[in-house]
Amino acid sequence: MTGEPDGPEDGTRGERIAKWLARAGVASRRDAERMIAEGRVRLENRVVATPATFVQPGALVTVDGALVADAQRTRLFRYHKPDGLITTHRDPQGRPTVFERLPPGLPRVVSVGRLDFSSEGLLLLTNDGALARRLELPANGWIRRYRVRVHGMVQERDLAALARGVTVEGVRYGPIEAGLDSRKGAN
């Protein structure tokens, strides 16, 4: 029912409790670790002392005395993000977030990557943080394609500069493949 931190590495010990709580929709992994540190989480009626504790399927887990249902299977959602929303759970500036606008009844989800506040388009959401990280890593070779509207005229030299990589405000960005779909006036 509970694997201690020094259990086997073969997957039979279950899943770390903070990750399990996050997949169950209780809280983010970081918030779950905080709950554990505060002594609010119990596994098989014993206070969990460390987030390195492992949970087996079917184990009895409670938070603040309330039973937590088993973690959900991994799910992936498509969301059309309109402009004017920020891709974060909490914005210190008080701007509206993607997560505040999701329909009720969804599990707790995280975004796969992000779109800027003024951007709109497809945003993938998942209840599995590890999947989100795998999909975000450039080393995994996922091709990302963006369509943008540019105000002003784009010259061939601008596209060539993007193909070589650019530095913006001291940050170096790698090369990207860019082309024009269409030209409409000054857009």
What kind of region is each of these model predictions?
Residues 2-187:
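Basic, flexible Lys/Arg- and Gly-enriched helix-loop patches that mediate nucleic-acid binding at interfaces
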